[in-house]
Structure formats: C-alpha cells, structure tokens
C-alpha cells in the first residue's frame, strides 16, 4: 500500500464514523429506537460514557490516556512494519481509525455516540468506530497467530 494511501484511508474512515454519529445525533432522539431492517438491526441513539458493553462508566481520562497509548503503539508498529503485509497495514488502519473516531467523541462530547443495535442477538449497542476496532483487532490477532505458526501467506 502506498504511504500516501494510509493517511487518506484513516481520514476517510474517521470521516465516515463521524458523519454517521453526527447524523444520528441530528436525526434520532436520545434512547429512540428506529427499526432500520426489522429483525436485523435498529438505530438507537445512546451516549456511552464507558467502554464497550458500557463497562468502566465515567472514566473519561482513563480512556483518553489509553487511546493515546494504543494509537501511538499502532502507529509505531505500522511505521516499523508497513511493508510487511497489506493485511497487517489494513488491521492497523482500522484500529487507528476506530480509536481516533471514539477519541474525538470522548474529548469533544464527554461520551461516545453509539447507535447500531443488532436485533437478532442480545448484544451491546455499538458504533462504526467500534466495528473498525473489532475487525482490526481480530485481523491483527489472526495475522500474528499465522506468523507465530510460520505461515506467512
């Protein structure tokens, strides 16, 4: 992946996350549920003052420091390894974008805007940045696991 594409991808993903959050705040009342695809998913505007699954509520400064450390580590790892694997770079782009997307909310609003509710399973309400983080971390785990087992494909 060309070096210029990395910051462009990160900015585009952050932009999408922030656009969705702004749309939700402007168009859905707090705690309102809108059935987008009945039985599949709804949009529900929540203000999450904790982490995933609403743990560690009202720990803003802890999350700000943790996010800066994680993003810093991911950026450092990317700079050191960006030519190693496109999949590795993609995983780090997702982690960095998701971290920054939620960081913006936490610093600017004091909470993270969540909105995606899966209706077919009992699961926490989440946002676009959370999706980036989840996919990025799972992809990174898979890559590191494959490297650990000697399979570099």
Swiss-Prot record:
UniProt GO cellular component terms: plasma membrane
Protein purpose: This protein specifically catalyzes the removal of signal peptides from prolipoproteins.
InterPro entries: Peptidase_A8 (IPR001872)
GO molecular function, one term: aspartic-type endopeptidase activity
UniProt GO BP: proteolysis
Coiled-coil intervals: none
Catalyzed chemical reaction(s): Release of signal peptides from bacterial membrane prolipoproteins. Hydrolyzes -Xaa-Yaa-Zaa-|-(S,diacylglyceryl)Cys-, in which Xaa is hydrophobic (preferably Leu), and Yaa (Ala or Ser) and Zaa (Gly or Ala) have small, neutral side chains
Keyword terms, alphabetized: Aspartyl protease, Cell membrane, Hydrolase, Membrane, Protease, Transmembrane, Transmembrane helix
Domain of life where this protein originates: Bacteria
Originating gene: lspA
Active-site residues, Swiss-Prot/TrEMBL: 114, 130
Location(s), subcellular: Cell membrane
Family: Belongs to the peptidase A8 family.
EC number of the protein: 3.4.23.36
Enzymatic class: hydrolase
TM ranges: 61-81, 85-105, 125-145
Major localization listed first in the record, in broad terms: membrane
Annotated protein name in UniProt: Lipoprotein signal peptidase
Membrane topology: Multi-pass membrane protein
Pathway: Protein modification; lipoprotein biosynthesis (signal peptide cleavage)
